[in-house]
Structure formats: structure tokens, C-alpha cells
């Protein structure tokens, strides 16, 4: 019908009345909770400075705790607790201007004193911070005022802004630091509401955060699901809304062909490797380690462990990282060569070794593939499946193993080869000298050349079997927004997530 001024006015009033009635109800019904899943539960706690497991930072980094800088999915570094920073030409002096108006969950005001405390704590004698070497390079910390902190380094470090955005560089509050594992107190947008051991962690939005109004999710439940089939089932049933780093490669088609879901694939800086205990005989013999290398078909492992979602690597470095070189030809798949190397090393088959595998699917599935390949050259790998806490204490802590499979997700962890007490037991004076040169070099071209030399050295010495760089796979409901595509580090930035229309 035609609308007269009166009917238009009445229609406008009716519409206004309808909006007045429906608007609040619609706002109240807008989803502000989410269930996210991870493969592993954090151990031993939620303090990423107190344990090596990447699952710790996946729960707490950028959520409970914050850092001076923040690393995005595109690897771009921005300020978080630091508003800005400057650096001297020799990269030895970093001056950070801190963000004002920041408070910890316990009400304490954040200042430069907390940065000084946190970084000195990281390098203290009793510290177990896995990036202790980063902080040991700090010669002096100056705090000229509450909003300024100056880091004076022993050696120039071009990677420092990135390193200060990782979980090992969280800023903590002195009174609560000792109990951060179970009662974490940070400056982040979320607080720990509950931890149901063996099942889930619940985080709730902290209204005292400076950007609380921009945080869309009021509560996030993080479930722990290590079994690949159970991961798929939880997504299909709707029990889980988003699963970053999911082990669902074989089942991706059913998600890709379902409009209820989104599948996001991207790059990662992770390295999945077969670790060999270099301190144990006969693995202390490079010929035996090279034989194990030669016995393994990387592509078959990628198919069996990662459902084809990975790129072969020949050293402890992921494609796309600065200075990366392709070294997959250094220790190629060659079973005849593997047998010959074992013979040269005086090994009479069968050589029996234990392979302790954590509960993640890539390790369990990859272990079966590798054990079958090793058997063809006279090596019997006896598989022992262990839980994650057992792996952390027995394999990583006590070094009680011959072989194991794990994915190292930290992007800047090559320096672990210079740690003689690290769990793979590698010691090399030549590598240590080379790594000192890498750390002291600030020119990108020269640094990349030295990084290439470092990659070649650990490849030729076959410290571990470098298998593949895994593809990052996220499966989520179609309405979840803000998920990362690429994974330059293991983190779940919950403040960026929301529900779309």
C-alpha cells in the first residue's frame, strides 16, 4: 500500500517500539563465551617461566600474563606493556617506555620496577626459565623512572624485541611470583577462574584490565584433548568451538565440506624431531646416529604422523626462518647406507633401543612408522607410551630415554645446542664457539651466514633426526572470528576472539 505521513509516522513508532523491546534481548543473547581445545594440559603449572612445556604459554601468554612486546600471527612485533622502544646502533641498549595505567590482578600498579624484578628473577641461580640465556645477556637494568626501563646488554641482540614477547619474558608481581603456577597474577585481560585437573581450565574476563571493554569473550573454557579421534568428535558434536593446532588432518575433508565449520591452515616455526640421547651408548657414536637418520623416510613419517601436513627439514630450523637453508640432502633416506654405518660402528643386529612417546598423536603415530622403518635395518625400537608429566620429568628432566619424538615450537631455540645439560645431551666446543659468534653478530647478512653454518653443523653431526615442520591447522565453528592463521609461536590470544553474525 501507499504510506501516508501518518502511516509512516505510526510505522516509525512501531519500529522504534520493536527495537526498544527486542534490542536489549538481542544484546543479551549475543554469545560471549567460547570453548577452545588444546592437545596437552599445562605442566607443571601456568607460569611459563617455570616449565618448558609450550602448553603453559598456550593458556597464559597474552591472556593471564603480558609481556613488553607482543608477537602477532604475521610475526609483526608491537608494544604491549611497552608503548614504544628505541635501540642503540650497536643493539646493546634498549630503552622501553612503559604503558601507563596498568595494574596487576591483585591491584598493584605496574612500573619499571616490575620489569627489573621479572628479568632478574629469570636469570637468578634458582631460575628454571628455559630462555635463561636471553636474560643472562643483560648486563644491567636501569629504571630512571616508573615508566622507563633501560636494558644494557653484554652483546648486541637483534632478536630481543621478539624474545621479550614470548612466555618466558612475562612480567610478574613480586608478592605473587612464587605461586603463579597455581594462582597466577598478571596484568592480562583474563584471570584464572578454575582449573579442573585432567580436563579443563576456565578463564574469565578481568574487568580491571585497561582494555576490558574491547574484550568480547566473558568466559573461555580451555579443554585438553590429546586423542585425535576424540578431537574430531568434540568438534563435530559442537562441544568445542575452536581447536588451534588440531590433529585432524585425516578428517579435514568433512570439516571443509561443512558450512558450519572453518578450516584455517598456515605456517609454523615448529620442528618435529626424533630426539636421540647423545650421552647414551651407542648413540654417542655419530655413525649410529647417521644410520638412524638414513633408516628413516621423512615423507612416510609426515604421511603417517601428520597426515601429509608438513614440510621435510634437514636441520633444527623451519623454512621461512631467517637464514634457513635446505639440508634435507645431508642425511637422505638410504637403508643400505644405514646398515653399512651400523656395521662400521661395530653394531651387531639387533640393536635394541627404547622409544618413549608423549601422548600427542604425531608422536604416537610417528613412533609406529619410525619403529617399522628402523626394524628394516636391524634396530628394534621398543615403544613406551608415557603421559606428558612423565615425559617432562623422565625424558626432559632426567634424560632417561634412548629415543623420543617431540615438536619444538619455539622459533628462536637454536641456542639449545650450546646447552651441555640439555636433554639431548649434545656437547661440542666447535658449536659453542660458532654460537658465540652468532650471538655477537648484529649484521643480518653475516648473521644469516653463520646461522647457515650452525644448521649444517648439527645436521652433519646428526644430533637428532630432523623430520618435518608441521602445518598449523585450526578447525572452528564458522562464527568464530580472530583466529590466527600462521603460528610464529604457540599462543592463543583470547582477547582477539569473538563471535560474528
Stretch-by-stretch model annotation:
Residues 202-205, 257, 283-372, 453, ...:
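Append "and occasionally in soluble cytosolic enzymes with long acidic Gly/Pro-rich linkers
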